[in-house]
UniProtKB/Swiss-Prot annotation:
GO terms for molecular function: arginine-tRNA ligase activity; ATP binding; glycine-tRNA ligase activity. Its main location: cytoplasm. Tetramer of two alpha and two beta subunits. It is found in: Cytoplasm. The keyword Zinc does not apply. Its EC number is 6.1.1.14. It comes from Desulfitobacterium hafniense (strain DSM 10664 / DCB-2). InterPro entries: DALR_anticod-bd, Gly-tRNA-synth_bsu, Gly-tRNA-synth_heterodimer. This is Glycine--tRNA ligase beta subunit. PANTHER family: GLYCINE--TRNA LIGASE, CHLOROPLASTIC_MITOCHONDRIAL 2, GLYCYL-TRNA SYNTHETASE. GO terms for biological process: arginyl-tRNA aminoacylation; glycyl-tRNA aminoacylation. It catalyses: tRNA(Gly) + glycine + ATP = glycyl-tRNA(Gly) + AMP + diphosphate. Pfam families: DALR_1 (PF05746), tRNA_synt_2f (PF02092).
Length: 690
């Protein structure tokens, strides 16, 4: 017979950001322990609220399944002597498996006879196993910043205040951090009280009666439905913000949404100035009309019921009014100083003690951005607009608005630039240059935004690597991986045919001209090429590229990001064709043999067989056209041209032996194969394909 199992860990208030990770850990750990302990079950659920974590296993077997296993021991010839008596090897093996030597039996494996022991383990009652399972579940949870409390050495998200552990209606007896397990849980902090749980099956129902909705998905759905219903009452809607919705879900136990109003005199402010305090500081949901225009309403979610809801509404409106009053003041004050005049104030803002001020950084970005525009062949007027964008891009960092609302950097700069009559390209570039701000964010679309964004991110990456700051494992405090991914994404989307090595060198020079010392350029180039190649690999894999396709392409380097991606695209298509098999076979055969060649160039006069003479002539005939295709980055046509050589290469291998005794002839043939490898490998090192 099966019973339900419940473990609830009651704590002090837990940060919302911990919840998703804990849910995954609890589920994975519980599944793992049940499998290891041979405990069958029907279903497994995990729960979290700000004051508890819980796991409910439905239909958990009352005892382990019995266990029978056949364990391989030594070979028969080592297990028995000439008289058939067990040797010390057999005796030791039997003893280790808990069986008698006479119980060993023989089985054949891969043509060799071995002795085996058959082990049988009777399943234990589940209740005997659960105290340790509960303890292991608790100690197996990990948090970003665990804490200690009282005089305990144990660390947890927040202090543990109660533990519920039930198997059916029976308490699972154990003690942890000075707390004895039991049936006593706690309801909502103000609306509920002590809750004596009768059985795991009634957990959700009993907790809901105590104003705790333990299922986070149920809470999330309730929040979303209430928000939509309230927005509809004023003819509006709420744009789905999963991050905000998740955060709100994990800071409440019993959701009640309410509609608040925004004072009309603040609606003239730029939309981000209104919505940022709402979302980032107050966790409110802005309400919009059907066209997406902001309405003078917000929705917030209370952790409680509808008691005194009017008073709660007024309190939230008052808090938002104070926030918006500050924002309105900052907005007025910031407009008194033109954006261009703020640039010089950046000299007093330290970017990094080893990398100078933000003003110095602006100059580096400005120089690099113009250089990129020039490398892309842009006319002088566009280069000027790129340079102007770079000059003003960081100016809003010293505004009152951005000082109080850092999330608005770039957004306010673009708005203030518009006010003083900067060109649209400059305003858009200022707005976009921080993009992508997070994983999955949009890339800049304007040329000013793209170029300044790449220059900004490259300066940050080169500077950080140059003073020895690199991401390690899961640690990346300067978000260098995200910035590198942004650089890769922008270059790919814009289709720039540009050398990463040259950009890194140009950025390095900018630091040197300001007297800022970095690690040697050669060391930086090597580290950064590897770093960007990892990011390129990640981006292309996300787009569906196979790992071995990327191995083949990236073995030839990724200095020109767009070209490497184009190669991967062509190779992915070509490897699916029937013609690719003989092509790759010819490449690999040529490659393996050419490795034995000396470094001398091919001299066709040393070739004697008609097949090799014809192949050498074909290589010369196609050399100029092939080089032109590679220069253009037309890898599909380059592959097609290289494919014309395959019949001639096959004819060569059928007609002659490469490794002949005549050293001059042998080296000529090996050099010829080396020339073939150079052309056939136009898409990558095909020997790395699985």
């Amino acid at each position: 017979m099966a019973k339900d199992f419940l473990l609830e860990i009651g704590t002090e208030e837990i940060p919302a950001k911990f919840a998703p990770g804990v849910l995954n850990q609890l589920r994975e750990q519980a599944q793992k322990y049940c499998q290891e302990l041979r405990l069958d079950y029907q279903d497994l659920k995990v729960y979290t609220t700000p004051r508890r974590f819980a796991v409910l296993i439905q239909g958990l077997a009352e005892k382990q399944t019995d266990f029978t296993a056949e364990v391989k021991g030594p070979a028969v010839k080592a297990a028995y002597d000439a008289e058939g008596n067990p040797t010390k090897a057999a005796q030791g093996f039997a003893r280790g498996q808990g069986v008698e030597p006479k119980d060993l039996f023989v089985q054949e494996l891969n043509g060799v006879s071995y002795v085996y022991a058959r082990k049988f383990e009777l399943g234990q009652p589940t209740l005997q196993l659960l105290p340790k399972l509960c303890t292991d579940l608790i100690t197996g949870l990990h948090f970003p910043k665990p804490m200690r409390w009282a005089d305990l050495e144990f660390r947890f998200a927040r202090p543990i205040r109660w533990i519920v552990a039930l198997f059916g209606s029976e308490v699972i007896p154990f003690e942890f951090v000075g707390l004895a397990s039991g049936k006593a849980s706690r309801g909502h902090r103000t609306l509920g009280g002590p809750v004596t749980l009768d059985s795991p099956a009634d957990y959700e129902k009993q907790m809901l009666q105590a104003f705790v909705m333990v299922d986070p998905e149920q809470r999330r759905q309730s929040v979303w439905e209430q928000i939509h219903a309230l927005a509809a009452k004023v003819g509006g809607d709420v744009e789905k913000d999963d991050d905000l919705l998740d955060e709100v879900t994990h800071i409440i136990e019993y959701p009640t949404a309410l509609l608040g109003e925004v004072a009309p005199n603040y609606m003239h402010l730029p939309e981000p100035v209104i919505t940022t305090p709402m979302k980032e500081h107050q966790r409110y949901f802005p309400v919009r009309d059907k066209e997406g225009k902001l309405l003078p309403y917000f929705i917030t979610v209370r952790n409680g019921d509808d008691y005194a809801l009017a008073k709660v509404k007024a309190g939230n409106e008052k808090v938002l009014k104070a926030r918006l009053e500050d924002a309105a003041f900052y907005y007025r004050e910031d407009q008194k100083t033109p954006l261009a005049e703020l640039v010089e104030k950046l000299d007093k803002v330290t970017y990094h003690e080893k990398l100078g001020s933000v003003r110095q950084r602006v100059e580096r970005i400005r120089t690099l951005a113009r250089g990129i525009a020039a490398r892309l062949g842009m006319e002088s007027e566009k280069q000027d607009l790129v340079e102007r964008t770079a000059l003003l891009a960081k100016a809003d960092l010293v505004t009152l608005m951005v000082y109080d609302f850092p999330e608005l950097q770039g957004i306010m700069g673009a708005d203030y630039a518009r006010m003083v009559g900067e060109k649209p390209e400059v305003c858009t570039g200022i707005l976009e240059h921080y993009q992508p701000r997070f994983a999955g964010d949009e890339l800049p679309q304007s040329y000013t935004g793209q170029i300044v964004s790449v220059a900004d991110k490259l300066d940050a990456i080169v500077g950080a690597f140059g003073i020895g700051i690199q991401p390690t494992g899961s640690q990346d405090p300067y978000a260098l991986r995200r910035q590198a991914q942004g650089v890769v994404g922008i270059i790919l989307e814009a289709g720039w045919d540009i050398s990463l090595e040259q950009l890194i060198a140009a950025s390095y020079v900018n630091f040197a001209e300001q007297g800022i010392s970095l690690l040697p350029l050669a060391d930086l180039q090597s580290a950064l090429q590897d770093f960007f190649q990892q990011r390129l690999r990640f981006v292309l894999q996300e787009q569906g590229a196979r790992y071995d396709t990327l191995d083949a392409v990236l073995a030839q380097g990724s200095n020109q990001i767009t070209r490497a991606a184009r190669k991967a695209q062509v190779l992915a298509a070509k490897r699916e064709t029937t013609e690719f098999v003989p092509y790759s076979q010819a490449y690999i055969r040529c490659l393996n043999l050419s490795k034995k060649a000396q470094t001398q160039p091919l001299d066709p006069k040393n070739l004697i067989d008609p097949t090799e003479i014809a192949l050498a002539a074909a290589l010369v005939q196609r050399q100029e056209a092939f080089a032109a295709l590679i220069e253009k980055g037309d890898y599909a046509e380059a592959y097609a041209l290289a494919s014309e050589l395959i019949p001639m290469i096959e004819a060569l291998f059928n007609a002659v032996m490469i490794m002949v005794e005549d050293e001059i002839l042998k080296q000529a043939r090996l050099a010829l194969l080396g020339e073939c490898v150079a052309i056939l490998g136009c898409l990558g090192d095909l020997s790395l394909l699985a």
